[in-house]
Regions:
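Glyoxalase I/VOC metalloenzyme domain signal
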Residues: 1-52, 68-111
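Short acidic/glycine-enriched loop/turn segments that link adjacent beta-strands
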Residues: 59-63
Length: 111
């Protein structure tokens, strides 16, 4: 399971800043990959259930949304539209973890 460490420098606009303002040590979010043809439906369903999106990011083939689930679940939900780029990214992360013994906590991909 990939674990993501976040060090925030600056967040804008306010709804994104609020979404990242949970006090540590808390789980920030759990992420799910959703079939591209069902991603809009999944996002709409979270909105209907009272988990509004506070960040929608796209870059090339990557398409992700963070939903505010903290009041209901204690953490946010991140939805990723399934794509080759997403699988390639997590393959890079998995490959970077090979042989990691914890002595160097921050490593560059390909290191």
């Amino acid at each position: 399971m990939p674990i993501e460490l976040i060090q925030v420098k600056r967040l804008e606009p306010g709804r994104v800043r609020a979404g990242f303002s949970q006090s540590p040590p808390r789980l920030h979010h759990a992420a799910y990959v959703v079939a591209r043809e069902r991603i809009a439906e999944a996002r709409d369903e979270l909105e209907r259930r009272g988990l509004p999106a506070f960040l929608h990011a796209t870059m090339g083939d990557l398409d992700s949304t963070l939903h505010d689930g903290a009041p209901v679940m204690g953490h946010h939900l991140e939805l990723h539209a399934d794509s080759r780029a997403l699988h390639d990214f997590f393959a890079m992360v998995r490959n970077a973890s090979a042989g990691w013994d914890g002595n160097d906590p921050l490593r560059s991909p390909g290191a």
